[in-house]
């Protein structure tokens, strides 16, 4: 039988359960928090579905809306979900292209957690009659996860007509 988490394991978690969180409207990666993965010997996916992502077009300043899917195979650290929510909210006034936002998010999460594998997929609502759905991924170099990343990238979105994201 496994035990729940001990208080000393949770001492770095400051946002979850805190009713006085400040919502930053400008890009704030330092809000991200982690906790230890208690199942380090096992490969498993953690997936976040984030349907309320907003950023700004760097040219027009108009808002862009997306659902973001973040999936990763943790190593030692895992991202805490409320800190991720506040982090994603901090893109609200961030002016960047869709592709840049997805790569920034992935890079920040790699720097934070050092996962075995991670992928970030943004499904943006159409503007000007065109939707943009950037997908980016990473697998730890010189490991089976690097090969996995290459395989998933090459096979990503093979049947886009089956994807209903609007």
Swiss-Prot record:
SUPFAM superfamilies: Tetrahydrobiopterin biosynthesis enzymes-like. The keyword Iron does not apply. The keyword Cytoplasm applies. It is found in: Cytoplasm. GO terms for molecular function: preQ1 synthase activity. Pathway: tRNA modification; tRNA-queuosine biosynthesis. The active site is at 57 (thioimide intermediate), 64 (proton donor). Substrate binds at residues 79-81, 98-99. It catalyses: 7-aminomethyl-7-carbaguanine + 2 NADP(+) = 7-cyano-7-deazaguanine + 2 NADPH + 3 H(+). Its EC number is 1.7.1.13. It holds the Pfam family QueF. Signal peptide: none annotated. One of its GO terms (biological process) is queuosine biosynthetic process. Keywords: Cytoplasm, NADP, Oxidoreductase, Queuosine biosynthesis. Catalyzes the NADPH-dependent reduction of 7-cyano-7-deazaguanine (preQ0) to 7-aminomethyl-7-deazaguanine (preQ1). Belongs to the GTP cyclohydrolase I family. QueF type 1 subfamily. HAMAP family: QueF_type1. This is NADPH-dependent 7-cyano-7-deazaguanine reductase. It comes from Staphylococcus haemolyticus (strain JCSC1435). The gene is queF.
């Amino acid at each position: 039988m496994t035990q729940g988490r001990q208080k000393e394991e949770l001492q770095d978690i400051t946002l979850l359960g805190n009713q006085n969180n400040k919502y930053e409207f400008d890009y704030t990666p330092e809000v991200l928090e982690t906790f230890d993965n208690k199942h380090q010997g096992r490969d498993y996916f953690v997936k976040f579905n984030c349907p309320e992502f907003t950023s700004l077009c760097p040219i027009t300043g108009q808002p862009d809306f997306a659902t973001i899917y973040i999936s990763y195979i943790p190593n030692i650290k895992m991202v805490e979900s409320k800190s991720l929510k506040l982090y994603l909210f901090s893109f609200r006034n961030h002016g960047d292209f869709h592709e840049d936002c997805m790569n920034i998010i992935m890079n920040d999460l790699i720097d934070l957690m050092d996962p075995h594998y991670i992928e970030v997929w943004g499904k943006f609502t159409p503007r000007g009659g065109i939707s943009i759905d950037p997908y980016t991924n990473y697998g730890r170099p010189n490991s089976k996860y690097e090969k996995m990343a290459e395989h998933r990238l090459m096979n990503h979105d093979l049947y886009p007509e089956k994807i209903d994201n609007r």
